[in-house]
């Protein structure tokens, strides 16, 4: 009788050990990188410091868009060979609909301190775009996002002085229309 019970338990344990774990049942670890997650918690924009200067204001940045499993979907690298001609991320924010990640940058070497090149990651097109290409040169780092996907930036020029880089004028665009 003991032998039968032992054999039965042995077969039971063997059967349990042979069962496969269904895919997707293991909880995904949160993506661990400096940055910000999208409002829908499906993507994370990682802001990594690269180059010879590890800390602001002279560091250079790499932006990686990752899914929550940690896979890199897109990368925008601002590292320069000499560490003084790249860019670093200053302000960054997701649009409320989670379709766009927007960030402003400054020169790592202090060149053109008036020009805050601003970029976006377009989730549907899986690509980065420069906002300046659609608005003109951005002269203030603090862009404003409003639902669902509007951006307002301050750009070069006034009605009386098209070369002005101190005051400029506001430009508002819908991110989903920038092609």
Predicted regions and their residues:
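Positively charged n-region of N-terminal signal peptides that target proteins for export
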Residues: 1-4
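Acidic, small-residue rich beta-repeat scaffolds with periodic aromatic anchors
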Residues: 10, 14-37, 50-54, 121-179
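Beta-propeller domains
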Residues: 58-75
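A short beta-strand motif characteristic of beta-propeller blades
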Residues: 73-83, 127-132
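Short glycine-/Asp-/Thr-/Trp-enriched loop segments that recur within the blades
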Residues: 81-88, 138-141
């Amino acid at each position: 009788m003991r032998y039968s019970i032992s054999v039965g338990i042995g077969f039971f344990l063997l059967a349990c050990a042979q069962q496969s774990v269904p895919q997707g049942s293991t909880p995904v670890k949160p993506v661990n990188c400096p940055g910000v997650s999208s409002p829908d918690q499906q993507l994370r924009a990682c802001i990594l410091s690269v180059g010879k200067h590890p800390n602001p204001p002279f560091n250079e940045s790499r932006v990686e868009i990752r899914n929550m499993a940690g896979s890199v979907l897109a990368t925008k690298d601002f590292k320069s060979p000499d560490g003084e001609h790249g860019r670093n991320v200053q302000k960054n924010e997701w649009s409320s609909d989670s379709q766009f990640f927007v960030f402003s940058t400054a020169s790592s070497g202090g060149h053109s301190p008036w020009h805050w090149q601003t970029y976006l990651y377009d989730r549907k097109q899986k690509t980065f775009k420069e906002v300046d290409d659609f608005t003109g040169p951005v002269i203030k780092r603090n862009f404003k996002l409003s639902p669902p996907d509007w951006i307002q930036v301050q750009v070069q020029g006034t009605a009386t002085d098209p070369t002005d880089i101190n005051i400029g004028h506001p430009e508002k665009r819908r991110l989903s229309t920038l092609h």
